[in-house]
Curated annotation (Swiss-Prot):
It comes from Pyricularia oryzae (strain 70-15 / ATCC MYA-4617 / FGSC 8958) (Rice blast fungus). It is found in: Cytoplasm. This is Eukaryotic translation initiation factor 3 subunit F. Component of the eukaryotic translation initiation factor 3 (eIF-3) complex, which is involved in protein synthesis of a specialized repertoire of mRNAs and, together with other initiation factors, stimulates binding of mRNA and methionyl-tRNAi to the 40S ribosome. The eIF-3 complex specifically targets and initiates translation of a subset of mRNAs involved in cell proliferation. CDD domains: MPN_eIF3f.
Amino acid sequence: MAVDHDDFLHLSKPLAPSAVGFNANVAPLTVTIQPQAILSILDHAVRRDIRDTQATRVIGALVGVRSEDGTDVEVRSTFAIPHTENEDQVEVDVEYQKNMLALTLKASPRESLLGWYTTSHELNSFSALIQNFFASPETGTFPHPAVHLTMSTDPGADIEPRCYISAPAAVSPDRAAESCFFIQVPHRTPPTNESDRAALEAIAAGKDDEARTAPVLSDVEALARSLEQTIDMLDRTSEYVGAVLDEEREPSHALGQYLMNNLSLAPKVDSVSIEHDFNNHIQDVLMVSYLTNTIRTQVDLAQRLALANLTDKDEKKEGEDGKAERGGGGRGGRGGKRGGGRGGGQQREPREPREPRESREPREPRESGE
């Protein structure tokens, strides 16, 4: 009697393709994506070639660090890789990828190749082909699995990164290079620090401008803006607490615990000490701003003086060359002129003509014997 069996697919352990003499480690459990890597991918997508002959998505390499056991990777930077893609084939500039990877690892020796990214959530045979390229022992991350990061860059849509690793799923050896099974792995984006947040706020300030530009604020202006934001957050918190006390809003235990934890971190100092420290901080900021402007003025003045000095030297040299040419044309006018004449080239005074001397009469010869 025939027995019906459900179709099933046997998957091997999610590792890179095995090779003789290599032992592969376990797949990463968590992928950490730094904000600067996401910003680099978005910049690559915005600056792509939008001609009809080019691909609609862009690809690039992921560079970062990996833990010793290989269970956690951190994507710190990326670089773009030129490629062409159509319905029949995909071509990747392998030589460019090798050179850029060598330069990146030379600048950051502790980092390594982690995988690749693309600006489309679609997974097809071309994605498997590129994934196997980045996971190969010759050009990829072997013995560690290559991480594939997909991210949508559609205008107006939310940024939704997804991370995958691959497992071999080929039916025949002939199709092993262009087929694999993508397995999604968890990822996280760490909270930004103060410097990253300030940079992102400065970039986002130009979203409402038609020219998409934003001026760089000075230290005093940045301090004033941060104070305004702090006062605004305090006002909103005070309004929320007041509404909860008046039973106008439902209380939140999580939010109350968060506020209590932050208030417990506040230093227990009086208002006079806070005002004194704040005034000292203001003076330090003003002093730094003054020194910065002074240094900028000195550098500008030094450049102007150096430029003026070079201009004077050029004019002086041109004047000396002109004098030399005029002096060379006046020489040789009088062939018998003595070298230098009378110091300073003075002319001789004309001499008075001499009176002719009287001719002497010839004497008669004496006779010998006298």
